[in-house]
Regions:
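ATP/NTP phosphate-donor binding region
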Residues: 1-69, 76, 80-81, 87
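Catalytic core of DAGKc-family lipid kinases
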Residues: 8, 16-19, 42, 84-185
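Cofactor-binding loop segments of dinucleotide-utilizing enzymes, especially the Rossmann-like FAD-
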Residues: 11-14, 96, 214-216, 288
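Glycine-rich phosphate/pyrophosphate-binding beta-alpha loops
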Residues: 144, 185-200, 268
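Short acidic/glycine-rich loop or secondary-structure boundary segments that cap or lie
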Residues: 144-147, 177-179, 191-195, 219-223
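Gly/Ser/Thr-rich active-site loops/lids in small-molecule metabolic enzymes
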Residues: 152-154, 192-194, 200-223
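A generic structural signal for short beta-strands and their flanking turns/coil linkers
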Residues: 163-167, 180-182, 205-210, 248-252
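ATP/nucleoside-binding phosphotransfer catalytic cores, i.e., glycine-rich phosphate-binding loops
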Residues: 171-173, 203, 213-290
């Protein structure tokens, strides 16, 4: 059952990724359903957002699935371009590598099969709005020296290089007593960066964010706490209960005397004040058929 008039595959690369285009074209041809599809090679995630938003404005009457073919930053950008576009415009994810955080949220679902994408079902998901930017999965502060292309690497040397921040965090209007903060994660989904399992209990359709604040502590202990955070086991280890604060919230405000950097699904946002809130049922995502 074809649910959309057109599929637009969005990826990064000015000259195009020949292997991606060939793989998509081959799979769509094998489906033999006469599906209308096209490609857009975005220069970067911000250009992808602008293109998707403009496309929605110019083609209001064409039901379109915008398929993000890339990592978290590109996926969030495509989703951001769909804000306010209406039910006829839907987000899809093509993730043959299995590293996309949004795809990893749906355990057991095959986001590498276009046949299952075409037969999939759209479902509403929330997004996080931070100031004027959006995230699908998570916002993270404090991992600048600890994240590589494979996700979190909380080695002792990385911990020693990182600085602690005096940050004021307000959750649904109530200030948290957090003291000096090493990092915090604000999650809509379960993963950040494709590998950081920061919020194993989070739901991306419940109208709330999962906040975890890691306090300042001796480096050796901090390294252990971060390993537990990365593997999604922090809440299961009573010995670490006093090392972090966890809340579920509709809104979170962050203030700092000096500029800090938030990572919004891999896109940096720099400032001293941030206002984050959940946007319920912000976009629809095609969940692949089983």
């Amino acid at each position: 059952m074809i649910r959309f008039t057109r599929y637009l595959f969005v990826y990064e690369g000015e000259d195009g990724d020949a292997r991606l285009r060939d793989s998509v074209s081959r799979q769509m041809k094998d489906l033999d359903k006469g599906i209308d599809y096209d490609f857009h090679a975005a220069a970067d995630p911000e250009e992808a957002l602008r293109h998707v938003s403009l496309y929605c404005d110019l083609h209001k009457d064409i039901d379109t699935c915008f398929v993000a073919c890339g990592g978290d930053a590109l996926t969030a950008a495509v989703a951001g371009g769909l804000m306010g576009a209406g039910e006829g415009k839907t987000l899809g994810v093509y993730d043959p590598s299995g590293t996309n955080s949004l795809a990893k949220y749906y355990e057991g679902m095959d986001f590498g099969s276009l046949a299952k994408l075409v037969d999939g079902t759209p479902a509403p998901i929330d997004m996080i709005r931070v100031n004027n930017s959006y995230a699908v999965n998570a916002c993270v502060m404090g991992l600048e020296s600890m994240v590589d292309g494979k996700g979190l690497t909380p080695s002792l040397s990385a911990v020693l290089k990182s600085s602690f921040r005096s940050v004021k965090i307000t959750v649904d209007g109530v200030a948290l007593d957090t003291g000096s903060v090493f990092l915090f994660t604000l999650a809509n989904g379960k993963y950040a960066g494709g590998g950081l399992h920061c919020a194993p209990l989070a739901l991306n359709n419940d109208g709330k964010m999962d906040l975890c604040v890691i306090r300042n502590m001796p480096p050796a202990r901090l390294s252990k706490v971060l390993h537990a955070l990365a593997s999604g086991t922090l809440a299961d280890e009573p010995a670490f209960a006093g090392d972090y604060t966890a809340r579920r919230a509709k809104s979170v405000e962050v203030e700092c005397a000096k500029d800090i950097t938030l990572s919004l699904d891999g896109r940096p946002l720099i400032g001293k004040e941030f206002k984050a809130r959940v946007v319920p049922s912000a976009v629809r995502l095609v969940v692949p058929a089983e």
